[in-house]
Amino acid sequence: MHKTTIGLLCLAATYQASAQTESAGNQSLENRLSQLEQQLASMEAKDASDDKWVTLGGRLQIDANIFDGAYNADNEGNTGSTIFPRRARLSVEGERSDLEYKMILEFAEETIEILLLRFEYTGFENGPTIKFGKIREDITLDALTSSKHMALIERASMANTMSPYFRWGVAAYQYFPSTGLRYAVGVHKNDAFGAEGTDDDSAISLATTGRLTWAHEFKENNLIHLGSWGSYRKMDNSQLSASFARAEVREPNVRLVNYAAGGDTVPLDHLNQYGIEAAYQYNSLLVQGEVARRNIATSDPASLLDDENYDGYYFQASYMLTGESKSYSKGSARFNQPKGVEDAWEIAARVSSMDATSEFQGTRAKSFTAGVSYYIDENTKIMLNGVHSKVSGPGTEALVGDETSGNAITMRFHYDF
């Protein structure tokens, strides 16, 4: 269609030129050619814009785990194993003018879930970006790091305890290049941590979340990141889920961080969560850590668990053996894998703890993880981790019996397309 249009315009220009004097004809021809160039540029720009409207992609992760001890306490701590699809996703995304969108479908063996359905409006000059739909809440640096970019196979127990990940809502965020500050604030439907998502009158239970970060780049691949976040979440008499985290091994028979072990779950009026985060990058080395607390307000103020606090932390270091450096996303305030990484090796280690104990119930898990990853290219990665966890607290015997420690070897094949 474009070629036909250009051909007709060329014929028209030639006809006009032959009907006039030579000088006038040359001038007319130049004008026509200029118009043709402008029209062609407009067509190409339109085609490029249309191409951005739909982009298809996906993520496949296959995991295999071997575990014993506390992770398999239901089977007397004997060695267990499993292989499963950790993530199987299809995505579609695009943009037109000031509006961007992305949708991710998560495939399980018997279900398909809309994991993310995000629209972003970027049309406010020198103003915030507005996003709405089913979006990721801005809670903890570790939880905000995409599974594509993680140095270890699973996130820290603290991050999995505190983050609700993707929830329906609306949020605004903005980065200020002159100061390195970034803020994010959002209001979301709270159907996480056992909350049903509505109160007794069928009104939506809401969560308000905010995160403030600061980053300073000393030179290329040398920067510091500091941040804090907080979240207030209405529970509206819903029972707080007993299990907080698995202790960094997916699909074990026992989830080791459990506030109700040896006791009971409790209905909540609301809960508060807040934390601080820090990271430092020096070329191929990245160190980061976070500390966070969950405070609960029970529906019955006379409950023994009213105003109970649950604390967690982790410290992690990773190093690219082949010299690459992680990239830092200023707009999202998080780290990504090295750009264009290929035929590269990375090692990482982490110590973490999540304490879900109270005076009479609950468990605490402390985990040590070490791992190595091989990047075939920027879309393909093989990972191997070793994990050792210790369980303690008044609910330990009820949860794991005499199996107070557990070991695991975890493996992953990752492919993006």
Where are these regions (language model features)?
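Intrinsically disordered, low-complexity regions of eukaryotic proteins
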Residues: 24, 39, 46-49, 65, ...
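Outer membrane beta-barrel
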Residues: 47-72, 77-236, 314, 319-339, ...
